Amino acid sequence: MNLQFRLYLLFILLFISFANGKNEYEDKSTSIIDLLSSKSQFSKLIRRLQRNRLVPYLNRNKGLTLFAPLNEAFPDDSIEPNLLYYIVNTTELDRSVLRTQLKSSDGQQIALKIHYKAETGRAYDKVNNAQIVQSNWRADSGVVQVIDNIIDLPPPALEILSSEKDFSIFHRLSVAWVGEYSSVTMLVPDSSAFLNVYTNTELAYLYSMYAAEDVKTLIHQHILVNQRVYAEDVIEPKTFHYKNGISISMKFDKDQKKLFINDVSTTKYDLLTFSGAIHTVSSLINPEIISFTPAKYLIGIGAAWFSEKLSRERKSISVDKTSKRAILAPTNWAYREIIDIDYHIIENFDLPAPNKYALYVTNIKSGNSVGEDTNALVRIATGSAGEMYVNVETRSIQSENIGNVSLYVLDKDIEPPQPLLSQLILVDEISFSVRYLASLGLGDYTKVTWFLVKNSAWTQLGLVHLVLQQNLELLESVMLDYAFEGIAFYGSSDEAWASGNYTTLSNKEFLIEGVYEDSNSRNKRDLLRINNEIYEVQTRDLLVKDGVVHLVDKVKLPFSVSQKDMIIAGGRKEFLELLDKFEMLDMLDSGYPVVVPSLTGSDVNTKDSSFAERHIIDPEKRNFVISGSRLSVDSSPWISIQDYGYSELGNVYFVQNAIPTKRQNRWRITFISISGLLLSVGICVLCYKIYFKFFRNRFMNQGEREPLLAPADSDTMAGRRNSSSLSV
């Protein structure tokens, strides 16, 4: 009896328990399909299960969980989700990431992720993007989790990488490699991890097409190919191997909810992708696997084509970063395939200090005129702001260092020094000298040190310059006096000239010595004494093939130019005809200054001898004054000088108007004086009229207004009446 009572009581308790726990989805059916069929809210899902032939699968297999969308999740009958993604082979939702029955092309299961409300603080658990509105609807064959929406498949890995700013560098590098794998676990460093390890130059190289193999190697340090590893797969530590055999360890601390890779915590984990998962890390894994070289750095700073040639022709130099050297590389737009690679390499290089230059020996061999094989030189200067110039005209636009190697990208290509004329033809400041060398056929001399005169010095010669241009024999003697046998470099800004006797190409021997100038001088000049004449060297060591050029600020003629030659060269032969007419040509070249006015043919016939004598100046007898570009003779008005020529035989001055006679001067002075006086009187009269008119009107107006301003007394009025009577 007691046993029967106990059984009856147990039955009653079980009945009450089931009654209290019952909800609208509860049923006594034994299969998942029967559960769904019992509720009209799943009619659309059942039709899709039937079309996809999944009904037998759900009826036949046990221990499954189906995430079942309500009819409201299918607003359009055309929506056909892959329902295998809604089925997982477990009834226990005891982990965040669950592998579904949907498989990738390599047969691995695509996962979904549960976001539990206890962790998120939401009202419902979520699976990917859908909310679980009713959980754990159980059947004998499995469990149904009712959801309010269609479950989105995980996005492709590249979509996640491109959408996150922190992944931008990894995305840019990996875009060519990630998509080729059906299953992959990615250990993605954030952008700061790259910036902490690599310089801008190194990143620029990695972004280039030349870095494909290096980038692939680096990316493969951060992906586990053909493996889908989620955090809860490694609650017990596991070791995984990359394709190159290097291994890493992974461990998930479930209590701390942290995933560790090589004992370093990830910043995020289990970001699901269609091909696997992304775990983010704050540092690179094995970054040292990539070795950077000078050739790679050249690519990073914009000289990729030069880098390719360097790697082909000088492979040992392209990878050596321990030797102290400089590599001068033209930028891509200035690159030429016929480039002399060795001329761009300098061993034992130190950059000159600001505002200094130095000559450096390059690696290229340059045969000279006598068959000697020497290394070609290159001239490198540094500007005040640290900018670098190569062979004067070429500028460095970017620089970088790797190990002991200095790399410079140039805006133009450089080549070994060319013959004199070819090398200097584009140097504007000595265009006169270069043209004269070409005209005289002097450009082919070898093993010569040239002191070339700047254009400004030639133009300062005035009429003498015209004489030289018209007399090539004289011009050649001048040019040869500034060309010395042998190559004499300064070597650098800090080197002094090696004083001594030097032989010119005209077989003269000159003493050349440096001139000391106080180093504390504010405007210190670079001076040389050549044959007792002081010159300022304005540019040192311009390199040419088999020679060197220094630019100087003036020219000294080895002879005296006659006044007659200067007058002829200036095109004023009428003045010579006038002198010849009066047999006065012998007065030229006597040391007297000659002022040459502009004359016509008729002037030669009409002017008298006094006119000619007036323009040949004896400074001891006449007052001759020059001020700037004007002259005056015997206190005459200033006359503008149009051109001039200086010579030991006498200077020549070209003017437009003739020097006036003393009588003309007196009349001119008188006229100017009278004109000045009349002008002064006129101004005074005008001022008086203006003054009188203004103040008279002012006083009259005041007198007229006075009765209105103040009433007069009776005596005053009477006096005014009397005065009026008298005036009538």
Curated annotation (Swiss-Prot):
Gene3D superfamilies on file: FAS1 domain
Signal found in the keyword field: yes
Glycosylation sites: N89, N404, N501
Alphabetical GO biological process terms: macroautophagy; protein transport
Vacuolar topology ranges: 22-670
Phenotype of the disrupted gene, per the record: Impairs atg8-processing.
Domain FAS1 span(s) in chain numbering: 29-151, 154-285
Function: Required for the fusion of autophagosomes with the vacuole.
Name under which the protein is recorded: FAS1 domain-containing protein fsc1
Organism expressing this protein natively: Schizosaccharomyces pombe (strain 972 / ATCC 24843) (Fission yeast)
Gene this protein is translated from: fsc1
